[in-house]
């Protein structure tokens, strides 16, 4: 073995009720970045051995929806909104999403990296080992590629796995004002082929909404993405029920995200597919929304529910995935087990890694979070304390610098 972790209380999150219950002290043997052994043997030959002294071990957390790479700051808009200034007026004054677009376009790759790393560090401190990162603040070929390159480069600076997603269909750039169909054609003809050829992303996302892109435009992007060998996912049913979730499910999309206005027909479409329902409680909270996602219907039809941070400067400036677990429980009434599975097992499925990440299981990637807590429910219950002891990513052990052993 390359690494042997002993005296670990495992929360494997394998299917079934026992997957959530902490085990008696066990050992985890890791070889070539994979979980090679799970059992009680503490004397296996290993290059490195660490006694965890009864600490709780879960799969590494997976943040399956973020907009982590961007430049600029929109805290002034936060103040304006709290003073009652409508979004339309904020946008007229140069704010809103286009202010982030302008800032991101002007920033170099080095500047984007410098601004992104502190946000990434926040996620890692909450136990994240895998993170999805979308483009969408460039809206030109050059700037979308710039964002994706910065996203991919993060794993060279931090111990983390990055899954880049192309979100050129995030907003209408000023150059295409009044010409949404032309912009969609530009994405399909100019951006997607280059991103696919250079392997800068594994999937393509679309903001399918009344203030974004309609169903026909979304399907045009989906069809193009699939033609280029890329998976699809969607921002759907956040502000209205357009049918974007059902469309995403029809294309066997990885996930449909937000879904506050999803109806029964949309839930049934998800149930007939492998598409995951991703809940984004941070945006719900920050925007003070009132329309709850249909949690009971999703449970009734057995649709897997992932949870993500949706880190972005406008609607979810939160860099702590355990805070999102707490919000999912308090705002959406998920159980702590559903919340933990939502940032591990189901988040892995939402990124296409259901057979390699999100569970502690032999043959799976050795991606682990090691905690100084008694029970997994503590992750959803308490926020703000230094609970993370260490992370393991592809078998590499990294102790959290803010946490000390007892």
UniProtKB/Swiss-Prot annotation:
SUPFAM superfamilies: Composite domain of metallo-dependent hydrolases, Metallo-dependent hydrolases
GO molecular function annotation: imidazolonepropionase activity; iron ion binding; zinc ion binding
Positions with a binding annotation for Zn(2+): 65, 67, 235, 310
Top-level class of the enzyme under EC nomenclature: hydrolase
The EC number(s) this enzyme carries: 3.5.2.7
UniProt binding sites for 4-imidazolone-5-propanoate: 74, 137, 170, 238, 315
Residue sites binding Fe(3+) per the record: 65, 67, 235, 310
Cofactor: binding comment: Binds 1 zinc or iron ion per subunit.
Pathway stated in the Swiss-Prot or TrEMBL entry: Amino-acid degradation; L-histidine degradation into L-glutamate; N-formimidoyl-L-glutamate from L-histidine: step 3/3
Residues involved in N-formimidoyl-L-glutamate binding: 137, 312, 314
CC cofactor: Zn(2+); Fe(3+)
A cellular-component GO term for this protein: cytoplasm
GO biological process, one term: L-histidine catabolic process to glutamate and formate
Superkingdom: Bacteria
Reaction equation(s) it catalyzes: 4-imidazolone-5-propanoate + H2O = N-formimidoyl-L-glutamate
Role of this protein: Catalyzes the hydrolytic cleavage of the carbon-nitrogen bond in imidazolone-5-propanoate to yield N-formimidoyl-L-glutamate. It is the third step in the universal histidine degradation pathway.
Family under the similarity heading: Belongs to the metallo-dependent hydrolases superfamily. HutI family.
Official protein name in the record: Imidazolonepropionase
Species this chain originates from: Vibrio vulnificus (strain YJ016)
Upper lineage: Bacteria, Pseudomonadati, Pseudomonadota, Gammaproteobacteria, Vibrionales
